Every structure is written in C-alpha cells, then in structure tokens.
Amino acid sequence: ELGSQTLGLLGFGHIAKAIAARAKAFGMRVHAANRSTVMSQHVDRMFALSDLHAFLAGIDIVVVTLPLTAQTQGLVDAAALQALRPSAWLVNVGRGPVVAEQALYDALKSKHLGGAIIDTWYQYPTPTLPECAPSKLDFAALDNVVMTPHMSGWTSGTVHRRQLTMAATTSVDRLSDD
C-alpha cells in the first residue's frame, strides 16, 4: 500500500518535483535530499546531501534523479546502500554512475536491498561497440531487479519528435546522394 510508504527523492529538480506531486496524491510521505534547500508543498521533510545516510535510513523507496557530476558520481555507495532498510527499493532514473555499480549489485544479490528498478546504466552502445550489456555485472540474473532500457523519460511526443528527426535525416541523406 503506497499510502503507508515513505518516498525519498535524491535530487529535487523538475522530475523529482513531478514525482513528489504524484506520490502525495497516493498519500505517501515524501522526503527529499538536495544540494540546496527547496521548499515544496509536496515534501514533508527536506535533507541536505551531506545528511544522505540519515535521509536514506527512513525511506521505503528511493528515487535517484540526480545528474552525473564529479560530486554525484558514486554518491550512493556501499555505505549509503547499507543505510537503507533491507526492504527498501531503489529506482534510478537519473544517471547510472550516481549509484556505485558493484555496491548496488552486491546489495541486491545479498538481499540487503529489497529490489531495484534501473532505467539508467553503466555502459551504453557506441559507434565502435554498437551492442553491449548495460553493465559488466549480471543484474538480469537477479530476481529483485527490473531493468528498462533508459526510456523512463520517453513520451508519445518524444517518439513523434524522434520519428520526424529520422524522417528528415533520411530525406536529407537521399537528396544529398542525388
């Protein structure tokens, strides 16, 4: 039951604010941790990033929405994951490397973490490596992980814009070949 859960938002930008509003509609308690204090009618308690472990200790579901910067890379490390309740879930829609890859895998495999929904990854295809696994670790073998292919931000509008871009690119390519 969502109404009895505490949602933690790691980062409080546009995406997290939208998630907070929806969580409150379900009656959830909402906590947020951010580098700067931001007031919101949808947040019951705000934490500084320097209080990360205290923030995580009271969370049932943590949603990582942080961008990848020198300050955020590996922010959610083994110690941070240990601060979470064993029944907690981690959802990453920010950037993969904000959460330490090996630490996350180990916490999930040992069942110290209830589960994870991962939409952002550690490895992506490149022109020289068009096919690659999303991680060097076998997250797919774990029964407490839901994996999505970095698509949480996609909407029908996103798909439509991409289709138009592809059509325009194809048309330009064909015209330039003539």
What does each model-found stretch correspond to?
Residues 1-86:
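Rossmann-like dinucleotide/phosphate-binding beta-alpha-beta segment
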Residues 87-178:
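Rossmann-like dinucleotide-binding domain for NAD(H)/NADP(H)
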